[in-house]
Each structure stands twice: as C-alpha cells, then as structure tokens.
C-alpha cells in the first residue's frame, strides 16, 4: 500500500517509479480520487452534524409539546441525502482497489530494466565441478536410484508433485534441520511453527491478494494455503505497535508451501524445479526504517552462508525494476549452479519491502522524540534460506558421481546417520 500524501507531494516521481515497473502514469487519478473521497466525506460529516442538531431540536420541541412536523420532514430529507452519499462511497472503494494493484516503489539502487535479462550480477562464489562425464539431471539421478517417484505422485495428485523415498526423504528432512540450526544458532533467528492455512486478510497483508489470487490455492471459508512462510511470519505483527527497542525481530520457519503455478505452462515440466507443493525455510525481519537497508545485506549473507556450507557454486543478482516482486522495493536473487542445464537457477530471493506491507497490515513501531511518542510503520524483509526442493536438485547434480551415486555434503552427514553417500540399494 502506498502513502497518498507522498503521491500528492511527488506525483512525477511516483509516475516515474510506476513506469519503471511497467505501469502507466497513475498519480493524477489517485490524487483526483483522493480529493473526491475527501469532498464526499466532508459532505457526509456536515449532513450528519446537521441531522444530529435537528434531532436534538425535535426532542426538545416534543418535550415542550410544540409542533415539529417541519423539522421531522427536514430530518427525513437529510437522511435521504446521507443514504445517497453512503451509496456514493464507492469512490473510496475505487481508490483502494487502485492502490491495491500498484506495486512497491523501487529503491534508488535498483537498476531500471524490463525483465530478468536486465538484472545485474553482484558477485559469484564457488567453483563449478569439472565433470569427466556428461552430468545427469536430478530427476534422472533420483529415478535411477529408485528414490524419486513422479508417476506415483501423479496418481495421487496429478502433475508437479513428487514422492521422495528413503535417503532422499531423509535428505529433505536433514536440509530443513541443518538450515534452521544455522539460522537459530549462528544468526539469532527465532524459530516459529505456524499454520499453513491462513485467512485471506493475511494474504492481503503481504501483497499476495488481490492481485495474485490465481497463484494460490483457496480452500473453504476464505482460507488460503500459504505460498511461503513469509505470509504467516510477517502477519505476526499485523495491527501491532512495537517499541523500537524491541527491533529488529528476526524469525525463521520451515513449512510446506503451495503454489498453483498459474502462467507456468510449459516451464520446468519435468522434475522438482517447479512444484505445486514444496518445503522451504524462510527468514523474516521486522525492523525500523533506519535498520532496513543493512538488514537486507545481512539477510542475503545468511542465505548465502547455507550454500557456502554446502559448497555449492552460486551467484547473487540484483533484480531490475521490471523483475521485482510486487511488494519488494529491492531484491537480491541467489542463483545456484545446475550442471545439467548449464546455468544458474534461483534458489533464494531476499527482499526489503520497506513500509509497503506494513501499511497493508497496519504494523507500526513507536519511539520517543522530544518527549513525544512518534509512531512509524515498520519495515519488513523476507528471504528464502533456502527452498529445500531446489537445494536437493543442486546437491544431486553437483555431487553426482559417474556411477549415479550421490556424495552427501559434509555438513549434512551428522543429520543423516553419518552416511557419506546415497546409492542404489
């Protein structure tokens, strides 16, 4: 959600920001709708005040047994006008509906561009494996080991699902425990276990609704399955007013995530790269305005640390204006090397949403300035650290051996009964 006062005071700047995000000029319409809303509400308050005065007059006249038919008729006329104006309050709805579909303003650091081709590489880490044989895909490796079953998953649930067995199921669990241990023990995040069904208001709070309604699964009674733990963790501070001394708040969770993958027809149709259901470890930070810039750098480094410990080659990209997520003001994508595709693929996305989500959730913090309490909107950040399914893909492909077995990364072996290799049983 946007600050209307900012739009009124900076219409050209706002239009430029929206154009950089592939939207047209919109500031004038927002200002006009806001003025209409203000005028309508002024009329409404004036009529309500007038009716209250007449009502008091009628009560007094009746008490004194004085005829008051004229006042009663006038009260009825005013009531009709009030009802008419209440019906016109759709102007307010139109303004909110418009603001609800406008993305966040890009940070000044964000490069201007149309799509992923205009993203900028920030840094790389790790050396790519020099295979002495043609590397297999993760799904070839998994199926050959009889540990990855797409056919049985399709019988149960259709396409874009997978069943992991034995050592791969253990690897999935090991990765979750490893990531959570790093985040909580080394970086001070608090682990949260939360529902995966949330009210639509929670989805609205982080910007998933209304614009991306088709991307999530709706159940009954206005519940939605979460596409990411970001939804649950960020909404823990909705309608809160936190003492600034309690910030930053850093939370982490591992949960199942559910995505309809609307618009992804034909993309990554084989394997685990793009699934309707997957596990992911998420990071969320709730901070002050002054803390948010450095917090994004810290969060990104935390996500990178997982890949460093797993010894997986990766690169960090800064997304351009045209590729930013809806709620993000600035985003770093971390892309891991996938040998079979001979390219880097996204495994984490770390974003600073600044006050955009906080306005939708009414999440604030307070400080004392010159003896007075000052309320401000918190800044929210979120990051994948990491998507577990894609981490499994990266491990299978980067740690594969010529015989089709998989060497288990050293940091995971204590989570897998000290096994050092995954092989066909």
Swiss-Prot record:
Question: For L-serine, which residues are the binding ones?
Answer: 228-230, 282, 384
Keyword list, A-Z = Aminoacyl-tRNA synthetase, ATP-binding, Cytoplasm, Ligase, Nucleotide-binding, Protein biosynthesis
User: Which is an annotated GO molecular function term of this record?
Assistant: serine-tRNA ligase activity
Question: Quaternary structure?
Answer: Homodimer. The tRNA molecule binds across the dimer.
This protein is called Serine--tRNA ligase
* Gene it is expressed from: serS
Q: Which family does it belong to?
A: Belongs to the class-II aminoacyl-tRNA synthetase family. Type-1 seryl-tRNA synthetase subfamily.
Q: Which NCBIfam families match?
A: serS
Q: Where is this gene product found?
A: Cytoplasm
Provide GO CC annotations from the record: cytoplasm
EC number(s) for this protein?
A: 6.1.1.11
The record's annotation in InterPro entries points to: aa-tRNA-synt_IIb, aa-tRNA-synth_II, aa-tRNA-synth_II/BPL/LPL, Ser-tRNA-ligase_type_1, Ser-tRNA-synth_1_N, SerRS_1_N_sf, SerRS_core, tRNA-bd_arm
Stated role = Catalyzes the attachment of serine to tRNA(Ser). Is also able to aminoacylate tRNA(Sec) with serine, to form the misacylated tRNA L-seryl-tRNA(Sec), which will be further converted into selenocysteinyl-tRNA(Sec).
Q: At the top level of its lineage, which domain of life is listed?
A: Bacteria
Q: Does the keyword Cytoplasm apply?
A: yes
Where, in this chain's numbering, is ATP bound? 259-261, 346-349
Q: Taxonomically, what lineage is the organism? A: Bacteria, Pseudomonadati, Pseudomonadota, Alphaproteobacteria, Rickettsiales
| Domain text | Consists of two distinct domains, a catalytic core and a N-terminal extension that is involved in tRNA binding.
Main location, first listed in the record: cytoplasm
| Chain segments annotated as transmembrane | none
Q: Give, as in the UniProt entry, the pathway in which the protein acts.
A: Aminoacyl-tRNA biosynthesis; selenocysteinyl-tRNA(Sec) biosynthesis; L-seryl-tRNA(Sec) from L-serine and tRNA(Sec): step 1/1
Enzymatic reactions: tRNA(Ser) + L-serine + ATP = L-seryl-tRNA(Ser) + AMP + diphosphate + H(+); tRNA(Sec) + L-serine + ATP = L-seryl-tRNA(Sec) + AMP + diphosphate + H(+)
